[in-house]
Amino acid sequence: MGESLNGLKRTIMCGEIRENHIGNRVVVMGWVQRKRNLGGLVFVDLRDREGILQVVFGEEINKDAFMKADLVKSEYCISVSGTLVKRESPNPNMPTGMVELKGEEIKILSESETPPIYIKENLDAAENIRLRYRYLDLRRPDMQKIFKIRHKTTKIIRDFMDEENFLEMETPILTKSTPEGARDYLVPSRNYNGKFYALPQSPQLFKQLLMVSGYDKYFQIAKCFRDEDLRANRQPEFTQVDMEMSFVEEDDVIELNERLIQKVFKEMAGVEVKLPIERMTWKTAMEKYGSDKPDLRFGMEINDISEAVSTSDFKVFKSAIEEGGSVRAIKAPNSADMPRKKIDKLGEFVKTYKAKGLAWIALKEDGIKSPIAKFLKEEELKAIIDKVQGKTGDLILIVADKNSVVFQSLGALRLEIAKELEILKDNKEFRFVWITEFPLLSYNEEEERFQAEHHPFTMPMDEDIEYLESDPGRVRAKAYDIVLNGEELGGGSVRIHDTALQERMFKVLGFTKESAWERFSFLLEAFKFGPPPHAGLAYGLDRLIMFLAGTENIKDVIAFPKNQNAFCPLTEAPNVVDENQIEELGIKVESKEEE
């Protein structure tokens, strides 16, 4: 049985001790990192949240403490009282390496079994083991460093928002299901039989209502939930830095958030973000990078070579252009000698993005090598090379298809080649860009209807409103995403604040007036009472912390994450519940038949 503290108080954290503390009598508490018995001396590395301190116990210092210290094992939780002295053999690799503690008294607060994972930095352990014993995984110094970064970052954000006169307000977790996009997590109501709450995918509607309520500037570090198929770096529950402002336009939101980004990255990463941050329209991003979240740390831009081959007899190019598509290319530098097998692999890669194939032209020392050269005139080949600014040693990769396929496949290929050529290896740059003027709507061919690109409350650009019903695909949105190194960090928009325009939007999305009012009556009703123009933005806090902590795994920045199957190996949630609980809810559970 562990000893109790009996009024003993810790006086300093292990990792905070430095040379200027030598001579002080201290009380430290923590976990045994390791123990070494060197005959007449026992050395214990004691670890707490702030770091590791070497403690030495000896018969000459205190015999009882020495004998007791010899009993401790890895991960025992102990307290030690004693005097700090200069270390005889300093360790310059440790912040506390010039000092050690002479242990005069020790208490074993609790014992530990042999841990199933090592408590050390850079642990190479299976993810399911780490998640199963997450409380041990979180003891590791590199994990604790991440959560200090998370804490400090949210504090900087809160302080900044407070200085900018924002109010931190909480919005409901149990709310109404308004499905449009990802699936809601549903919570059955015991009091209202057959009815359900939904967990919020974002605080979107409530923050708009707060603007109608006259709160002017709102923010929240908000928990959000989406019941969607998990891709890499997605979690069913995640955290947003959410904000909304009244009487503002797009530029106001962008300007404020640029200053916030600048502050966070200066204080947390020591990086000076130059303002204003570059802006790029969605159309330009797609045409140049094949993505609405372009990674601008490297070039390899997409080039439209349709004009260069517009009179070509090569059937693949000709039919793509005739059918309203295009022929576009990227240039892989110094890759002309890429093995044919690798090029064929890249051809298979673009097919996963619905491209029919990949044409290529290698600019070798001894001339041009290409399976399509025989189909192209000499001047067409020259025009292609000129358009992509090709030089000897380069490899030109070409896709011909409808524009959406060309953009998607070449955008993905651009990133794949950058990975293959290790273009971004050891690149520590933070490259921001705002993407603006998104399409307001996109056509869902399966459902045969238009759907909102962001959400149905986004304001169309003023000059495009007239096309809302007649040509919905043409309408651009007052929407903006902040992108960092090819990842969407956050997104926002100016909101519709007019009932009539909001009803028009719902109609284009396929809602009847009745169904729109049934789902969103509380918002539409509120818009009858003088709503202000308003706009906002939300960041993915987890993704922001990933950048600041230098990890590519979202599970590293969430204390208790789910695995790739939305399952918690630690608590085994989701799990079965008592039959009584289910009966109270008026729910009948049927087994899903295996497909």
Swiss-Prot record:
The subcellular localization recorded is: Cytoplasm
Q: What are the binding positions for ATP in this chain?
A: 226-228, 235, 488, 540-543
Where L-aspartate binds, per the record, is at: 180, 226, 454, 495
Q: List the record's Gene Ontology CC terms alphabetically.
A: cytoplasm
What catalytic reaction does the record list?
tRNA(Asp) + L-aspartate + ATP = L-aspartyl-tRNA(Asp) + AMP + diphosphate
InterPro entries from the entry?
A: Aa-tRNA-synt_II, aa-tRNA-synth_II, aa-tRNA-synth_II/BPL/LPL, Asp-tRNA-ligase_1, Asp-tRNA-ligase_1_N, Asp/Asn-tRNA-synth_IIb, AspRS_core, GAD-like_sf
Q: Give me the ranges of the annotated region Aspartate.
A: 204-207
Any keyword Secreted? no
UniProt-recorded Gene Ontology molecular function terms: aspartate-tRNA ligase activity; ATP binding; catalytic activity, acting on a protein; nucleic acid binding; transferase activity
EC class of the enzyme, as a word: ligase
Enumerate the UniProt keywords alphabetically: Aminoacyl-tRNA synthetase, ATP-binding, Cytoplasm, Ligase, Nucleotide-binding, Protein biosynthesis
Cite a single GO BP annotation.
Answer: aspartyl-tRNA aminoacylation
Q: What's its job?
A: Catalyzes the attachment of L-aspartate to tRNA(Asp) in a two-step reaction: L-aspartate is first activated by ATP to form Asp-AMP and then transferred to the acceptor end of tRNA(Asp).
According to the record's subunit comment, the protein's assembly and interactions are:
Homodimer.
State the name under which the record lists this protein.
Aspartate--tRNA ligase
Which species? Answer: Clostridium acetobutylicum (strain ATCC 824 / DSM 792 / JCM 1419 / IAM 19013 / LMG 5710 / NBRC 13948 / NRRL B-527 / VKM B-1787 / 2291 / W)
